[in-house]
Amino acid sequence: MGGNSTFAAGKVAAYRWKTVGKIDGVKVLELKDQGLSRKLPEEAHSSRMYIQQHPDGTFSQLRIYDHFHRLRFEVGFHREPRLDRSGSPVLHYHVYTYTSGSSHFERTEARRVTERMRKKLGKFMKGV
């Protein structure tokens, strides 16, 4: 399972993630080294969507990728101070856009997940 970047020092980066299960056919990933960055990969080479869960099995994050394997959409459940100043986790999303011909992306500010999104993606959000 891919690293968070494709190349390092001119070589393919070592895999940082392992598949630990599936939910409705979508891979649930876990870091091989728990000390590394907890963000799911920015690129996907074997799936169009990945899920990450907390150690207790509750939902943490999901990312959806386009046909070029680039990150396009992310849903997360963690603190997001711009949406909730209490410090409590909040279910929110970001949309990613790319400059034509570039691998550079822009991410929108966090927005609360809509009811429509919850209906479509809720089966992946255990415990939220």
Give the location of each predicted region:
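Catalytic toxin/effector domains delivered as secreted proteins or via bacterial secretion systems
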Residues: 2, 6-128
